[in-house]
From Swiss-Prot:
It comes from the Bacteria. Keywords: Cytoplasm, DNA-binding, Transcription, Transcription regulation. GO terms for molecular function: DNA binding. This is Probable transcriptional regulatory protein Dgeo_2194. It comes from Deinococcus geothermalis (strain DSM 11300 / CIP 105573 / AG-3a). The lineage of its organism: Bacteria, Thermotogati, Deinococcota, Deinococci, Deinococcales. NCBIfam families: PRK00110.1 (NF001030), PRK12378.1 (NF009044), YebC/PmpR family DNA-binding transcriptional regulator (TIGR01033). It is found in: Cytoplasm. Residues 1-21 are annotated as: Disordered. Signal peptide: none annotated. Gene3D superfamilies: 1.10.10.200, 3.30.70.980. GO terms for cellular component: cytosol. Belongs to the TACO1 family.
């Protein structure tokens, strides 16, 4: 993920070409299978990590059949199957932006080397653990195209912490543990969330424009192209024409 607007991120991924979309799907399949192994269950009702992985996959329009098959393969996987580890990295990008990266890897040395190489090539720098993590908060985020007061009331009554309205719809923020309660309440009230997932939200944003904005997006794109990288978050407030 890149930039500040979650709606812009959804549009970018939906508009990805076939090669890029295939890579996005592969990352989600890996995350789902790792969640099954780490959580010890193929049932999302009994495995929160799997439930979160499925929600993230659905947000990126991964087909239901792909998700189901990934779970089945992970449940039946042999003991010798690759054991992936969740790791995070932090760094700085053009315009003084903070970058937080989530990765899933079976070789940490390879992953950190690949990430450092991208930062060095694209005008950024890899930081130490804790250098920028404090600038982000883990939150649940629900996107809803319906901007009615009724929808907002349902969200607030069921635990929403913040609601941002734009031309695309509502971006509803929740505590991580309240995500599914709010999403289920909206669905039960007849509203249809576009997506709902756990993500990292910047506490404050930095306006980035012009050449710095283009360089930042090139850096984020290059990081997202790495097989081990699952998510890339920045605190950048980017112009719409750059995020698109």
């Amino acid at each position: 993920m890149a930039g500040h607007s979650k709606w812009a991120q959804i549009k970018r991924k939906k508009g990805a070409n076939d090669k890029k979309r295939s890579a996005i799907y592969s990352k989600h399949i890996r995350a789902i299978q790792a969640a099954v192994r780490s959580g010890g269950s193929g049932d999302p009702a009994a495995n929160l990590a799997l439930k979160n992985a499925i929600a993230a996959a659905k947000a990126d329009t991964v087909p239901a059949d792909n998700i189901e098959n990934a779970i089945k393969r992970a449940v039946g996987a042999a003991e010798g199957a690759a054991d992936y580890k969740e790791v995070t990295y932090e760094g700085y990008g053009p315009g003084g932006t903070a970058i937080f990266i989530e990765a899933l890897t079976d070789n940490v040395n390879r992953t950190v080397a690949d990430i450092r190489a991208v930062f060095n090539k694209r005008g950024g720098s890899l930081g130490n653990s804790g250098s920028v993590a404090w600038q982000f908060e883990k939150k649940g985020v629900i996107l809803l195209s319906d901007t009615s007061e009724a929808a907002q009331e349902v969200a607030i009554e069921n635990g929403a912490e913040d609601i941002q309205e734009s031309v695309d719809g509502l971006e509803i923020s929740t505590a991580p543990n309240d995500l599914y309660a709010v999403q289920d309440a909206l669905s039960a009230a007849g509203f249809k969330p576009e997506s709902g997932q756990i993500t990292m939200i910047p506490s404050n944003t930095v306006a980035v424009n012009g050449d710095d904005a283009r360089k930042l997006m090139a850096l984020v794109d290059a990081l997202e192209d790495l097989d081990d990288v699952q998510n890339v978050y920045t605190n950048a407030d980017l112009p719409e024409e750059v995020e698109a």
